[in-house]
Amino acid sequence: MCRGCRKCHETAECSILDDTKKLMAEYEWADKIVSVSPSYWADIPGQFKVFIDRCTPWCNTHEPHAKISGGKKGYTIALRTGPSMPECEKIIGSIEHFYGHLEIEASGKLGLCKVEHKEDVAARTEEIQEFCEGICRN
């Protein structure tokens, strides 16, 4: 969890030794990044937020900052149990905000409401496949 020490604002590196660098190496390797998030009280889960906070060394709002290579495309899928698409849009907005600070182009999004059980996802297979095929085409 980010401690707010701001060392990364001076060195572009974090003082915490965990797997964040390994995960960011995967981001560096990838051309396309797909983030999928359920709704936890109308936003991304705490674990996802902790990861985003830990990516501060790569955030383009301060210099120096670590960088991943450009030209990456980011896609987002948000799921929630309720019927309100604005809640999915809030989740998508949080993830696209994260992408923006890593200079990843937000290139597609899918919000899935009324998803509580596996069967609810299975009923949306065609919609999900179309979204995934779009990722492959772009």
Language-model segments: which ranges?
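N-terminal beta1-alpha1-beta2 submodule of the flavodoxin-like/Rossmannoid cofactor-binding fold
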Residues: M1-N60, G100, S107-N138
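Short, glycine-/small-residue-rich phosphate/pyrophosphate-handling segment
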Residues: E63-G108
